[in-house]
Amino acid sequence: MTKGILGRKIGMTQVFGENGDLIPVTVVEASQNVILQKKSEEIDGYNAIQVGYEDKQAYKKDSRSSKYANKPAEGHAKKAGTAPKRFIREFRNVNVDEYEVGQEVSVNTFEAGDVIDVTGVSKGKGFQGAIKRHNQARGPMSHGSHFHRAPGSVGMASDASRVFKGQKMPGRMGGNTVTVQNLEVVQIDAENNVILVKGNVPGPKKGFVEITSSIKGNK
């Protein structure tokens, strides 16, 4: 069955393994996870739990700022006996009977050695050219070349008379939802609500991440 938890990426560091190897790890803080809702096949068409992470500021009248919860979010969280949450996700393929609404989910859900998938929003790079954005090759940089970092041909002239959808062109790079699969949990620090994950995970420091059991590695 799937296990899952939400958290924030704190940054990277390194730890020593039992055999003395130096292991690069990403530190993920995962406290304040609360079950907001249980979904069942009879009512919702599928089984899942809805988990919320990190408290949001209470509803403020006449404020449209996203840092304040709205009334529906407050009412939804009130049913679970908790405050509105900033980061909410659902986890399917879980044993719903093991959870109750309002229950807290701790980092002890996972153990050292577990194989996990981590989902986050990649770092935004702004507007970039085709070479950086799509890893295309440069043209000749020598004297006389008219083609250095341009994207090249984007399609035929008279026959198609248009640029096809999906053509790799300059544009905004990053800021996409990315999942890195089959990462290893190196260490669990229950006292500080921290998970140490081997390697790097998507997103900037303080970015929200979603950790689930590996869809491939645990079969």
From Swiss-Prot:
PROSITE patterns registered for this protein in UniProt: RIBOSOMAL_L3
A GO BP annotation: translation
Xref: Pfam families: Ribosomal_L3
Keyword RNA-binding annotated: yes
Keywords: Ribonucleoprotein, Ribosomal protein, RNA-binding, rRNA-binding
Keyword ATP-binding part of the UniProt annotation: no
InterPro entries noted in UniProt: Ribosomal_uL3, Ribosomal_uL3_bac/org-type, Ribosomal_uL3_CS, Transl_B-barrel_sf
Region (Disordered): 62-81, 136-156
GO cellular component: cytosolic large ribosomal subunit
GO molecular function annotation: rRNA binding; structural constituent of ribosome
Family that this chain belongs to: Belongs to the universal ribosomal protein uL3 family.
Function of the protein: One of the primary rRNA binding proteins, it binds directly near the 3'-end of the 23S rRNA, where it nucleates assembly of the 50S subunit.
Annotated protein name in UniProt: Large ribosomal subunit protein uL3
Species of provenance: Staphylococcus saprophyticus subsp. saprophyticus (strain ATCC 15305 / DSM 20229 / NCIMB 8711 / NCTC 7292 / S-41)
